[in-house]
Regions:
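Alpha-helix initiation/capping motif
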Residues: 175, 179, 231, 276-280
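Short, amphipathic alpha-helical "lid/cap" segments that border enzyme active or binding sites
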Residues: 85-88, 235-246, 281-288
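C-terminal tail/cap regions
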Residues: 2-4, 9-11, 247, 251-305
Length: 305
């Protein structure tokens, strides 16, 4: 089916009333567009955000467009395990279901920084933070019928490599290399979690998405401005891949969704292929073991109950 507008594509997504969807980083960029779209489909949104002022401002913007929307703002700092633990406990105590967890928030090619637990910020937030969060919310997801986990990756994963000797980028830090590593980790986590969930006989779809080249912030240079006019799509378009993965029909676990246009840069979403490295089961197992050790989390104990 050839699409001409976001509105036309949106008409293919059914009403989602009765569902509760949690989105990390829902106050800006792709996460905001996810929340805005899904609120319009009747979804109860949990906006998990670090900055409450920005989150409440984003909530107001969405409610201005969708006055009947239900959006809860909860504070979550993915760079701090204590915040993740406190947030997760609050979610488990407050909600009786969780239909979709969208792990969207990301630290993108920042100057070198560390999380509270001294992990490189990108790897700590983009991978380890979401790895711990997902584990803590897994009991609620598993008791919710037809639940899904969506990990937002990036085409940058194709340039990534998991450097187990330098996961924290302490020996040498290159922002793009570190970002690619974290986005590759997102995909390895996606596929391995789906394998483990399936092996345990649990009903949960774990999928990944990427936005293509989406405009999530103003151009930072003349070159970026020129490129954005030529190739970069809007954040609203970029968010459609995640929305399809989260609530679309005929979605399969362990799949990857992104723009269907030239080189997956832009376009309406479809199933796409990740890199060969992202599909490396041995690499995924090794990263899983390292991630459990670094986060102090055991998925086996959760999946065995």
């Amino acid at each position: 089916m050839s699409m001409k507008s976001i509105e036309e594509w949106a008409s293919t997504i059914a009403d989602q009333s009765g569902k509760i969807i949690l989105i990390t980083g829902a106050n800006t960029g792709l996460g905001f567009e996810d929340a805005r779209f899904l609120a319009g489909k009747g979804t109860h949104i949990i906006m998990a955000c670090r900055d409450l002022d920005k989150a409440n401002s984003a909530k107001k913007t969405i409610l201005d467009e969708h006055p009947g929307g239900v959006l809860d703002v909860l504070q979550l700092n993915l760079a701090d395990f204590a915040s993740i633990d406190e947030f997760s406990a609050r979610v488990l105590d407050t909600y009786s279901q969780l239909d979709v967890l969208i792990n969207n928030a990301a630290a993108i090619m920042t100057p070198y920084q560390k999380t509270t637990q001294s992990f490189e910020l990108g790897f700590g937030v983009n991978h380890l933070g979401h790895f711990r969060l997902t584990a803590l919310l897994l009991p609620l997801l598993l008791k919710t019928s037809n639940a899904r986990v969506v990990n937002v990756s990036s085409s940058a994963h194709k340039f990534g490599k998991i450097d187990f000797e330098n996961l924290n980028s302490e020996k040498k830090y290159k922002p793009m290399k570190a970002y690619g590593q974290s986005k590759l980790a997102n995909l390895l986590f996606t596929y391995e979690l789906q394998r483990r969930v399936s092996t345990a006989g649990k009903q949960l779809l774990v999928v990944a998405s990427h936005p293509g080249w989406a405009k999530t912030h103003p151009p930072r240079s003349r070159l970026q401005g020129w490129m954005s006019k030529l190739m970069i799509q809007s954040a609203a378009m970029g968010a459609l891949s995640t929305i399809l993965a989260a609530v679309g029909n005929n979605i399969e676990g362990g799949k990857y969704y992104g723009p269907g246009g030239f080189m997956e840069v832009r376009g309406f979403p479809k199933e796409v292929q990740s890199s060969k490295m992202a599909r490396d089961i041995d690499l995924a197992t090794k990263l899983w073991t390292a991630s459990e050790k670094l986060t102090g989390i055991s998925y086996d104990s959760i999946l065995s109950t």
